[in-house]
Amino acid sequence: MDALQVIARIHTELPEKFGVPRQSGLVPQLRGRIVFEPAYRNPEAVRGLEDFSHLWLIWQFSGAIRQDWSPTVRPPRLGGNRRMGVFATRSPFRPNHLGLSSVRLERVEQSEALGPVLHVCGADLMDGTPIFDIKPYLPYTDSHPDAVGGFTDGLESRCLRVECPPQLLERIPADSREGLLGVLTGGLTATSGGIAAAVVFSLLAALLVRAKEKR
């Protein structure tokens, strides 16, 4: 088989790529639901998965697909001023447009309409992102305490202070507030004030629209 098969899609509160956390795990409050495609909704396929606390997701950068690719990219963590090899970064602009994320598995729901649904936290995926594979995270082999982080070691982590008026928070679904504020304060790549403000506005606007749709 030459083509990868989409086995599932994740549903999050992030409808566009500009608000997605720069890495998985940076916003542990951000919730998502993984819904399998009809051909893969057999409950037997997830038997035993509930015994694991974390999962690996292999997915597609569906919002950043390009026909060509560049051997070097400008990582946002370096301010966009220094080029690094694409395989030395996690840039979405890769030959195969594949992403890898580690998420916490909160629970496995058995839905009559959708089959097994995985409720996860800490994902860095846009709503509707196609998933190619799901694997359990194995601490004894996947954790490397002596790992070296290359150019990311020693970089300062910046956070935004976000103040949201109570009347605005009330218009956002209660189960989405903590994750949204987590994205705005610590999940975004360091940017200029103007760009950050635009991202904040975009995220708030998108969630307000979704809040209206749920009513």
Where are the predicted features?
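Glycine-rich, low-complexity intrinsically disordered segments
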Residues: 1-102, 106-215
